[in-house]
Swiss-Prot record:
A motif (Nuclear localization signal) lies at residues 88-91. GO terms for molecular function: DNA binding. The gene is SYCP3. InterPro entries: XLR/SYCP3 (IPR051443), XLR/SYCP3/FAM9_dom (IPR006888). Belongs to the XLR/SYCP3 family. It holds the Pfam family Cor1. Residues 1-42 are annotated as: Disordered. Its main location: nucleus. GO terms for biological process: cell division; meiotic cell cycle; sperm DNA condensation. Residues 52-57, 88-91 are annotated as: Interaction with DNA. This is Synaptonemal complex protein 3. The keyword Nucleus applies.
Length: 236
């Protein structure tokens, strides 16, 4: 009785062995879904024994400590569960490593494919851009050459135009001087003509006066001769 009292006091401080067993059984039931082969067979056998004994105790209505046998059984179940968990962990690690390896290979393949595609695309467009830039440089050189030619032609035309303006200015100056000389010569000629005309008129007047005087003298002489002749005829 004393021992049972001690056991009862121990149960009051911790969860009962039945509760521990129930938790272990529930945990085992959840983990058993992921196990395979002999591990599941061992756990299912031990679970069946524990379940059978628990049902006997429940049907008898006797609540007592399972003692060392149940404790050993639970420890065995715990060991089996640990082994199963360890095996599951190893399988999970292997699967994880395999998955990581496969994923790395896929990622590496995808990365390499993308890199090749990017490199191919870069090469293709780089060549196109290079060709376009070369053509652009050629066009720019041609444009600069044409611009230089046009500038040279413009400078030549400007120089020719300046020379033409100088020549035209000189010719215009010559024309102006010639016109002034012409006007001056015309004035002098008109003046000379006036002088000549005046001199001719004066000479003509002098000649007319002399001729008139001569005619008058001849007329007088003729009249005198006629009178003399008449007188002579009358006298003789």
């Amino acid at each position: 009785m004393v021992s049972s009292g001690k056991k009862y006091s121990r149960k009051s401080g911790k969860p009962s062995m039945e509760d521990q067993f129930t938790r272990a059984y529930d945990f085992e039931t959840e983990e058993k879904k992921d196990l395979s082969g002999s591990e599941e067979d061992v756990i299912e056998g031990k679970t069946a024994v524990i379940e059978k004994r628990r049902k006997k105790r429940s049907s008898a209505g006797v609540v007592e400590d399972m003692g060392g046998e149940v404790q050993n059984m639970l420890e065995g179940v715990g060991v089996d569960i640990n082994k199963a968990l360890l095996a599951k962990r190893k399988r999970l690690e292997m699967y994880t490593k395999a998955s990581l390896k496969t994923s790395n290979q896929k990622i590496e393949h995808v990365w390499k494919t993308q890199q090749d595609q990017r490199q191919k695309l870069n090469q293709e467009y780089s060549q196109q851009f290079l060709t376009l830039f070369q053509q652009w440089d050629l066009d720019m050189q041609k444009a600069e050459e044409q611009e230089e030619k046009i500038l040279n032609m413009f400078r030549q035309q400007q120089k020719i135009l300046q020379q033409s303006r100088i020549v035209q200015s000189q010719r215009l100056k010559t024309i102006r001087q010639l016109y002034e000389q012409f006007i001056k010569s015309m004035e002098e000629l008109e003046k000379n003509h006036d002088n000549l005309l005046t001199g001719a008129q004066n000479e003509f007047k002098k000649e007319m006066a002399m001729l008139q005087k001569k005619i008058m003298m001849e007329t007088q002489q003729q009249e005198i001769a006629s009178v003399r002749k008449s007188l002579q005829s009358m006298l003789f």
